[in-house]
Amino acid sequence: MQAEFARELLKRCRENGIGTAVETNLSLPFERMEGLLPYLDQMFFDIKLMDDVQHRQVTGISNATVLENAQRLAHSGIPAVVRTPLIPGITDTVENIGAIASFVRTLPNVRYYELLNFNPLGEEKYRALGLTCVHEGKRPLKKEALLALAQVAQESGIRVVYGQE
């Protein structure tokens, strides 16, 4: 993230009455994001996996920074939306969604928890770049499976938003 550029852009938007938001995976050190906070109206951030071993296997990094940043941002007073991209066979388990929802419940200032159904449109981008898509052939969850995961998350007592197949 180009922190200085982003900060200046957000500042100018705020000065001109334009609403501001940032979407992040929270993997950067908090100090890189901290300067943006005075200029944000809301944040969107992903929590993909609660299990650190799985998170390392899938993303290549620990989720310790992600979870710590989620807590720090939630306590900053800026309204937030927490999201989980539902990747078939990876992030779409009952255990994972339940664990994330339980964590989200502890965070203040979260407007809602959003389950983002898998979108295979990225496959074409990979092919165009001559790259292998590790998710090739995977499809969005069916309505019933998505609803079941949403119900698991709702059992934590949080507001859950999800899209259809």
Residue ranges: model-predicted function:
Residues R83, L146, A150, R159-V161:
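A generic structural signal for ordered secondary structure
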Residues E155-E165:
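Radical SAM enzyme core and accessory elements
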Residues S102-R105, R111, R127-V152:
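A structural motif corresponding to the C-terminal lobe/cap of the Radical SAM core domain
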